[in-house]
Amino acid sequence: MVSDSKLELPLPVNQQKPRRRRILKVHLLIAALILSAVGYLGKGKWIWTPERKAHFVLTHFPLIDGHNDLPIYLRENYDNRLLNISLEHLPGQTDIFRLRQGHVGGQFWSVFVECPSLDSNSSLSWNRTGEYEAVTQTLQQIDVVKRMALYYPKTFSLTDHSGKVKFDFLRNHISSMMGIEGLHQIAGSPSILRQFYDLGVRYATLAHNCDNVFADAAVDGKRTNKGLSPAGRDIVREMNRLGMIVDLSHTTPETMHQALDVSVAPAFFSHSSAKGVYDHPRNVPDDVLIRVKETDGVVMVNFYPAFISPHPENATIDTVVEHIMHIANVTGSYRHIGLGGDFDGIDMVPKGLEDVSKYPDLFVKLAERGLSITELADIAGRNVLRVWKTTEDLGHSIHEPPLEWEDDF
């Protein structure tokens, strides 16, 4: 038996060191969450209805969406002048009020810039002069995301590493990450890629709707590189070194496979759906889904009706569920699925998923299909956080010098 004289009781919180107090507060909060869950289970008459499952998951685990185009919406409609508007209520598909209704806990904001028009006097499949302008515009889009967090500090929290998401969630903040959507935005320069990373960009889509010097686009591309160019292989390895996520959405199947051959990180698609459900070039083929499983990666399912259904006008929330179920069937689990709605970058929406407030309805639908709380939590955000952390850890383990060539094409 341990005597009272030898039993070391914890000091009152106000007498503990700051770091110890912080750790204790986190532990107490975790304990409260566990007790809350036990309380749910302990009520003899409690029934886990689909609605209760969905609510439990979305209030205990951060929902992280892989792709939202609010920044370009703000540019095109308001010239990025945030002081002239309120982000609480906007006429598009995303605003603070509806993000809260949708229980969004984290968002990868796309700092998208359109592909430059090709030079009719050049035989190249890219326009380097136009790409230089895209670099400038990308910096402006990064800035607008940072100003979102500056002007709404109780809502948005700039987040540059995966471990911060859980703490943002506990503070009721929406983790705000950034991704560039096409390597035309770096104008052939790995140094620009590195500077974007230092500014907070955490994924880069290899191509948008145009080929670039690195990779081929699935839509409006010309198969210029027949997948990845030699420079593209180098840039994928540089992204691995940085700990930046390699995003394969928008790319051709050849590009997907070749990138997975080169990359040491898990496969990642920020906003793509299943080609096995609808044969659209923006979707992921089944043979690539197998590789997603092999690399322990994730496909963030897109909601755009034109990508998910041969009859876009008839697309519904159930259409999105079918894509999710197909990916689960091919990969053998729900471990490789996330959500990348593409809101404010799409001109039509599925019935039942009209805006960012509708995520709870999607989780109810998934719960009705028999998904467990663990599986729902995986789809909500645990899968993408796993992929992100693995990518970060691999970056820390790569001890190579930065890629030093500049625009050598």
From Swiss-Prot:
Assigned EC number: 3.4.13.19
GO terms (BP aspect): proteolysis
Protease is among the record's keywords: yes
Substrates-to-products reaction catalysed: an L-aminoacyl-L-amino acid + H2O = 2 an L-alpha-amino acid
One Pfam family from the record: Peptidase_M19
Residues of the signal peptide: 1-39
Binding-site residues, Zn(2+) 2: E181, H250, H271
Annotated SUPFAM superfamilies: Metallo-dependent hydrolases
GO molecular function, one term: metal ion binding
Superkingdom per UniProt: Eukaryota
Gene Ontology, cellular component aspect: Golgi apparatus
Cofactors demanded by this protein: Zn(2+)
Record keywords, A-Z: Aminopeptidase, Dipeptidase, Hydrolase, Metal-binding, Metalloprotease, Protease, Signal, Zinc
Gene3D superfamilies linked to this entry: Metal-dependent hydrolases
Positions of Zn(2+) 1 binding: H67, D69, E181
The protein's enzyme class: hydrolase
Family: Belongs to the metallo-dependent hydrolases superfamily. Peptidase M19 family.
Assembly behavior: Interacts with dil1.
Record-linked PANTHER family: DIPEPTIDASE, MICROSOMAL DIPEPTIDASE
Protein name per Swiss-Prot or TrEMBL: Uncharacterized dipeptidase C3A11.10c
Native source species: Schizosaccharomyces pombe (strain 972 / ATCC 24843) (Fission yeast)
